[in-house]
């Protein structure tokens, strides 16, 4: 649905706050539909030029919460909806989440989901917005991961930033997802030590569980 920009920004902030509280999830957010498209009886059409869309996307994410538990993307894709037997534009936050899931299956969470090796977007006919090199730089410096069409490479995710607004190790998707993975694994090991005596044996057992895991 083509909701107002402010409504979409508020929803994005709520989703990010949930991820921040949980500490074991990441919120994937796409810009509002009105940043690119006009929906009418004849269908959806791209209504802005690339420079205007760049400004629209940056403007959309500017007030959205700074968080390493969020990932922002830049565009919508045009795809075939087999259930409705029609083509339509859809946001790409689901695709970026899918890249991370596919990365977990084929590699590990601490691998970047971006690039031609792991960042290929499937089931896309075209993009509503394909940023130029200059526009990619503008987006990336404003926490937005560009999605581009690359000749010979197809449609790919071309950035691996989180929504964190300051320089940090956690401004990278793979670093944040690595720490989510580690925290979940270590907390599971810690649960096994609950209600044991707080003595040298218990502490040594815990260290012997965690240290080999971290080394591997």
Regions found by a protein language model. Give the residues of each.
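Structured, hydrophobic secondary-structure cores that serve as assembly/anchoring elements
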Residues: 1-216
């Amino acid at each position: 649905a083509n909701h107002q920009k402010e409504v979409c920004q508020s929803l994005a902030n709520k989703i990010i706050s949930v991820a921040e509280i949980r500490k074991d999830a990441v919120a994937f957010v796409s810009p509002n539909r009105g940043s690119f498209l006009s929906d009418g009886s004849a269908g959806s059409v791209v209504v802005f030029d690339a420079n205007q869309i760049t400004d629209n996307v940056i403007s959309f994410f500017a007030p959205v919460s700074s968080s390493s538990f969020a990932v922002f993307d830049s565009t919508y894709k045009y795809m075939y909806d087999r259930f409705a037997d029609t083509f339509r534009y859809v946001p790409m936050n689901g695709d970026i989440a899918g890249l991370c899931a596919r990365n977990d299956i084929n590699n590990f969470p601490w691998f970047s989901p971006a690039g031609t090796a792991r960042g290929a977007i499937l089931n896309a006919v075209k993009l509503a917005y394909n940023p130029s090199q200059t526009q990619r730089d503008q987006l990336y410096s404003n926490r937005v991961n560009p999605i581009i069409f690359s000749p010979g490479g197809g449609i790919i995710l071309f950035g691996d930033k989180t929504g964190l607004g300051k320089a940090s190790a956690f401004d990278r998707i793979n670093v944040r997802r690595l720490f989510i993975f580690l925290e979940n694994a270590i907390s599971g090991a810690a649960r096994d030590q609950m209600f044991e005596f707080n003595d040298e044996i218990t502490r040594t057992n815990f260290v012997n569980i965690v240290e080999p895991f971290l080394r591997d």
